[in-house]
A protein has these predicted regions:
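Active-site loop/lid in soluble adenylation, ligation, and acyl-transfer enzymes
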Residues: 2-130
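Broad gene-expression machinery/nucleic-acid interaction feature
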Residues: 5, 12, 114-116, 134-136, ...
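Structured core elements
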Residues: 16, 56, 136-138, 169, ...
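An acidic- and aromatic-residue-enriched active-site/binding cleft used to recognize and process polar
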Residues: 20-22, 60-62, 140-142, 171-176, ...
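Helical (often loop-to-helix) elements that flank the catalytic cores of nucleotide-handling enzymes
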Residues: 28, 76-92, 146-163, 182-212, ...
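Short beta-strand
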Residues: 58-60, 168-174, 215-219
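Short, conserved secondary-structure transition motifs
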Residues: 63-66, 179-187, 218-234
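Signature for HUH/AEP ssDNA processing cores
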Residues: 100-173, 184-192
């Protein structure tokens, strides 16, 4: 079967869309055209959260039942009008990552057309790439842990953090976990923000020893929810609000 192609105008940019009838979710019958339509529709909302942030993608070129891969670097075939930024050690050019950034509806459509189902972003945005503008507490439960209990725990953590004067938001990850996010002014480096997160989390975990832990190794926390503060390290990402998930 010949591959279908279609040109469309999104804002100032002409984008060639391909394989619009490719089934990405076999069990539900959702095709790539519907993924593109979703990201175009949600663009004004999601861009408020991710515009100016370096992005990583989980791509599913053959649908969610096929192989997937995590992409950080800007591909060679990316059009010049897609915003991008090189980050990393300037003394080690080979180790720097050329991240893509979402700037408008057209970039969202281009990402979706390349089966970028999941969007993940770092914790800083232009121009303060070295200074996070939020701290995240990632609640990661073990397999089979009741999701309502994770939600309840996240609101306990929110209340605890608010007791320390922070304004917090709770968001789902689209899978089994929950994020508690605390907005920050971009004034502090990643190390300072990580230390802050760990310092705040330690008393919370000590008061809930039977249900929570800061232990990162899964074999040492079989029945406990990890309060993952290590997500606040440089180059770590979290899934974007309103991102589709592959599973």
């Amino acid at each position: 079967m010949a591959k279908t192609k279609q040109r469309t105008q999104v804002g100032k940019h002409t984008i060639e869309l391909t394989n619009l009838e490719k089934v990405l979710w076999p069990d539900d019958g959702f095709v790539k055209a519907e993924l593109i339509q979703y990201y175009l529709t949600i663009a004004p909302t999601i861009l408020a959260h991710i515009k100016g942030r370096p992005l990583s993608f989980v791509r599913f070129p053959d649908g969610i039942d096929g192989e997937s891969f995590f992409q950080k670097n800007r591909p060679r075939y990316c059009p010049d009008w897609i915003d991008h930024e090189k980050l990393g050690d300037e003394a080690a050019e080979g180790k720097r990552i050329d991240y893509l950034l979402a700037a408008d509806e057209a970039s969202m459509v281009w990402f979706a057309n390349h089966a970028c189902i999941e969007l993940h972003h770092i914790h800083a945005r232009r121009p303060h790439f070295d200074k996070p503008d939020y701290v995240v507490f990632d609640l990661d439960p073990p397999e089979g842990y009741p999701f309502p209990d994770v939600v309840a725990l996240s609101f306990e953590l929110k209340e605890y953090l608010e007791g320390h004067g922070y304004h917090c938001f709770v968001k789902t990850t689209g899978r089994k976990g929950v994020h508690v996010v605390v907005p920050l002014e971009p004034r502090y480096g990643f190390d300072e923000v990580f230390d802050m997160a760990k310092t705040l989390a330690q008393p919370f975990v000590r008061s809930r020893k039977t249900t929570t832990t800061l232990e990162i190794r899964k074999d040492k926390r079989p029945d406990k929810v990890l309060i993952d503060v290590y997500r606040n390290r440089p180059s770590q990402t979290i899934v974007a609000p309103y991102s589709v998930r592959g599973s």
